[in-house]
């Protein structure tokens, strides 16, 4: 996990039985709105 002083965060979680990597990242916009992205990295 990584979080910067300006509110950007990133988390990657190890692979599942198919080798897929799960994770999420996000930030807060200038307007104060939280943006969160969740992903699965696969082939």
Curated annotation (Swiss-Prot):
InterPro entries assigned to the protein according to its UniProt record, in alphabetical order: Insect_cuticle
Record keywords: Cuticle
GO MF term set: structural constituent of cuticle
Signal peptide (UniProt feature, chain positions): none
Domain Chitin-binding type R&R as annotated: residue spans: 1-43
PROSITE patterns: CHIT_BIND_RR_2 (PS51155)
Keyword Isomerase among record annotations: no
Function: Component of the cuticle of the larva of flesh fly.
Protein name: Larval cuticle protein SC1
Taxonomic source organism: Sarcophaga bullata
């Amino acid at each position: 996990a990584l979080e910067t002083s300006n509110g950007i965060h990133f988390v990657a979680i190890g692979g599942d039985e198919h080798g897929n990597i799960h994770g999420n990242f996000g930030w807060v916009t200038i307007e104060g709105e939280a943006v969160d992205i969740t992903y699965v990295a696969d082939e």
